[in-house]
Amino acid sequence: MITLITEQLQKQTLDELKCTRFSISLPLPDHADISNCGNPFQLVSEGASWRGLPHCSCAEFQDSLNFSYHPSGLSLHLRPPSRGSSPKEQPLSQVLRPEPPDPEKLPVPPAPPSKRHCRSLSVPVDLSRWQPVWRPAPSKLWTPIKHRGSGGGGGPQVPHQSPPKRVSSLRFLQAPSASSQCAPAHRPYSPPFFSLALAQDSSRPCATSPQSGSWESDAESLSPCPPQRRFSLSPSLGPQASRFLPSARSSPASSPELPWRPRGLRNLPRSRSQPCDLDARKTGVKRRHEEDPRRLRPSLDFDKMNQKPYSGGLCLQETAREGSSISPPWFMACSPPPLSASCSPTGGSSQVLSESEEEEEGAVRWGRQALSKRTLCQQDFGDLDLNLIEEN
């Protein structure tokens, strides 16, 4: 099989290659002069090769409707004849001349969006044709203002005047549209959320009627649209909403708490699309745990660390000399000698003392005990007992 294919390929030459023709229905001019390009009714058989075709820079017409072109030729553009010259005067070579593309007629690509262009908050160029299906989510941020201030605390409710119906309702009843100004009353739709920020460009203040759900321009409304940041998602806080914010002198028990405000917060509410920097809502963040105050480390007592038990010494000699009661050696090592014998004027005689003398004697005794601890039993810090430190 392979040998048959190779033999056929060797026998094949360029003369045997058939030309590929494109049949395109093309209307011809009525009386065109096509003498330069040969007979238009010339029949070309499919078996003819490229070398058999006459060398002509133009297309060859067949049956006055179909034409085949040279492989070296480019795409041909038919230019319509001008009004001043008749089709008889124009030869077909001028009619079928390739026309250079006009740079003015080329489609201009749109400019790339800027860095600050946000897709979620973008506004199209033609605001009148854009009617999105987006509606505000049923969250607490879109409740009417007249329902605010009815929650919260156990204190007495503060009575407030309900705002007029024209500016009270902020609920969107129908599909919003992106109109840059307040729409007239005959429009059957209401503006979206960012038209509140765009409405400050208009000369007349805007208001809404809750019956029809459409926004209208009214010069007799109480206040213009509240100025806010352009395309902001934060809820609009106008003069009506600022009346229900708690003042600096109010307490949580005296002023009602707003239902859309989270409990325990006293700052302005934030939208879901904006980052929230509240520590209470950060879950799963690793922090250094503070030390438990119930488990305190024992403080180091250097006076106890300096005590070193030993069998013989100055303290034992002093206590044996005074004839005190027998006590364990670790207790006698640093216990001061009893001062009853030294405090009495006569060596072993007992003496009845008054209360004031007993208090003075107790103070002198404590002072001597502290002095004896420092002088008799004090060791330098380089000679510490590790076992005693571990026990303490």
UniProtKB/Swiss-Prot annotation:
Here the segments flagged for biased composition (Low complexity) are 241-256
Q: Name one GO cellular component term.
A: nucleus
Instruction: Give one GO biological process term.
Output: protein import into nucleus
Q: Where is this region: Disordered?
A: 77-120, 141-167, 203-303, 340-364
For the modification Phosphoserine, the affected residues are: S122, S162, S232, S234, S255, S273, S299
Point to the regions of Basic and acidic residues compositional bias: 278-303
Which keywords belong to this entry? Acetylation, Phosphoprotein
Keyword Phosphoprotein in annotation:
yes
Biased composition annotated in UniProt, kind: Polar residues: 83-93, 203-215
The family database entries (InterPro entries) matched by this protein are listed as:
FAM53
Q: Name one Pfam family in it.
A: FAM53
Regions crossing the membrane = none
Which residues are annotated with the PTM N-acetylmethionine? M1
Instruction: Return the similarity comment.
Output: Belongs to the FAM53 family.
Task: State what protein this is by name.
Answer: Protein FAM53C
